[in-house]
């Protein structure tokens, strides 16, 4: 009889409740290369030892339940159970611990982020013995990574499709996000693309509302793309949001975008769901479409430091599920994002191999085994004065996306796009000539504005706009060197 089906008659069955740590806390366990490893921030209820709390997480997210069951004897728990193998105290926080859990790979369906998350971040997050629980990081083993398609195309293929190299890409979210007619929306797209942007974008909640149905928007945006391409000689795109109420409708919209010949579409991957997102990513690879991903709803999940899921985990999940771009914060704009933490998950999106680095919040070494990379998108409250910092922080393999920072230009949409393109080209040239963007950024922008009236006007409008608020999600004291 195989170990998987062996009946433990010699052990016998004893009903009742026993401590989780007797079965699921195994500090001597040596992790395997095929294990999925998780780092949980655990805040136990008063009186619950950290070992019991960590073991409870391992049990409730794998094979365990609240009482002993006789069917445990029909399988091999040692083969399938999750194990809490290490616990460390979080310095500077009262009664808070990092619990490390190892999961055997056989617990998870191949190629399914949905199944992986249903286990690891499922019912355990409502467990009464814990005051709070947060998933800080995951190590995805190479054996599991290879079961995913990942991004439809990846960074290098996108650059080849667009024929654009050596600089960040420029984008703009059309504003107001709701209320424009399809024709006026298309006009704004055309003006921004003609002015020098690479992309424009539907906002995350632009789907198919009474004021602008999706098919009309797609048609007017396609017209804007082709007209601006003819006038500028550059390849242009607009992120056509295919997110819909059903997967069937989502794919119908994606197919229509393909028929129009546009280069890129968009999906809200958290509100749309991982199953829908993975399906769309497969469609995009099969049909040559790039896929832009918006992270609407992420802050509900990731912003609180003691409960939820850290965005670095959501970013890893997106790379598995599939997307060529994803919003990743700005560090300098209006949205949450501490610099070292942001750079940590930006590397996890782009790079093929990332070493463990607790100073950037990275708990595990991650090998993506040639899974294509994802371009991080900096978006939210940014303008021309931020361009040097953004170019310095995110580097060439990124998308810098200015909504109000384009459409809020006093002379209109096209001049706003011109201002952003001039500022970017000036920063890239200065960097290539050896200047320090962090130190010389303002002088670079001022110098460029002398021969660009559009940039000069933008500099004047936004010279005093700042968002000086402390990040909620910060590094722990024991992570800061």
UniProtKB/Swiss-Prot annotation:
EC number, as in UniProt: 4.1.1.39
Site (Transition state stabilizer): 334
Residues holding substrate: 123, 173, 177, 295, 327, 379
Signal peptide: none
Location of the active site: 175 (proton acceptor), 294 (proton acceptor)
Broad EC category: lyase
Modified residues (N6,N6,N6-trimethyllysine): 14
Post-translational modification: The disulfide bond which can form in the large chain dimeric partners within the hexadecamer appears to be associated with oxidative stress and protein turnover.
Propeptide residue interval(s): 1-2
UniProtKB keywords: Acetylation, Calvin cycle, Carbon dioxide fixation, Disulfide bond, Lyase, Magnesium, Metal-binding, Methylation, Monooxygenase, Oxidoreductase, Photorespiration, Photosynthesis, Plastid
Entry binding sites for Mg(2+): 201, 203-204
Entry-linked Gene3D superfamilies: Ribulose bisphosphate carboxylase, large subunit, C-terminal domain, RuBisCO large subunit, N-terminal domain
HAMAP family from the UniProt entry: RuBisCO_L_type1
Family named by the database record: Belongs to the RuBisCO large chain family. Type I subfamily.
Function statement: RuBisCO catalyzes two reactions: the carboxylation of D-ribulose 1,5-bisphosphate, the primary event in carbon dioxide fixation, as well as the oxidative fragmentation of the pentose substrate in the photorespiration process. Both reactions occur simultaneously and in competition at the same active site.
Subunit text: Heterohexadecamer of 8 large chains and 8 small chains; disulfide-linked. The disulfide link is formed within the large subunit homodimers.
Other information: The basic functional RuBisCO is composed of a large chain homodimer in a 'head-to-tail' conformation. In form I RuBisCO this homodimer is arranged in a barrel-like tetramer with the small subunits forming a tetrameric 'cap' on each end of the 'barrel'.
Protein name per Swiss-Prot or TrEMBL: Ribulose bisphosphate carboxylase large chain
Organism annotation: Cuscuta obtusiflora (Peruvian dodder)
